[in-house]
């Protein structure tokens, strides 16, 4: 008889873990507290009827590039990736926009004087993506499978974005690099902030920054559908208060952050391990707004209409100042804003002729400050008349994010700070294993961290199976 396992949380990592266990022949139930599976990968009507908004994640470079997701027949279960003509636009105050094109050579040409430097930064990893992705989307190995490639990445990754940006001569290229680095939620003068910039750029050139047709829920639904073919079950509206109440299961994989794991694991976890989890640090938060629009955003630069993702923040120096303020517990007067406009490329997101947009800025964890005016001022700066396009808006504060997904602690959408210490010990030196032999953690608080890629769940499940002698 196959062993019965339980995955707590039906986010992408929980579903990935469940699929790995089911593929190994285990019985799997996935228990999800919310009425809809997906965690932060859900699509909901948040403004007006007929307008579909991604609650959390919206653009999926690491989803499309995930070694595990790529191994699954998700297209047979309804997943369709849509690529905008350009992955990213970064408008500037002169009315032009710096474009990150899918084609690396085209991007190098557009960056002119910085084209060669851009190529040196990213080309080795773009050309060897099939080797690079499994390395970067997993726990740090003492001896990498591709040591030369990873040594080259490490030489850049351990630096700050500020340091690496000194190689770039044009303010336009430096601005582009700053926006990419800001995905780290770190100050741009901190170690590892360069790693995020390079990874985001590499993924754009290697696999693109696609959106799922119909929204992030389509990825979730495809994962659930495939899991069902393996006889796995997803049971929604089933919050778990304590593992002691789940006596029918022999193995637990928890798509939970350390704070929730302490509560759910209770006395099943050793006191010393609970203490380690208790010292885990959460990062800056997102202040998010969803928009129903009567037309496309009126960008000064029409190039912005070619990209599903737009970075709003101006120069490197301005973005660096904004991120440094947030990291110091302050609120920026000119915040870096990340905006997506999926309905330009996926007409299923809004009624005919109408559009949706999604934008957030960074704020300190747990912030209660209303950043709506400052966020919209940044959009208006590069798209005058934007406010006149708004039919309805839904503000989602950090506390709202957490209430809609308990893993988004204080509004942290990345599963915890990714500074050097917490990068190495995420969430502890054990990574996926806990002090209990039958309990594992598989959330974004484990390697490789945030992003929708399922690799935290994949590696956690593989670790659990190895401990059972099934690998």
Regions found by a protein language model. Give the residues of each.
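A conserved FAD-binding loop/helix module that cradles the flavin
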Residues: 442-468
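Helical element adjacent to the flavin cofactor pocket in flavoenzyme catalytic cores
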Residues: 199-244
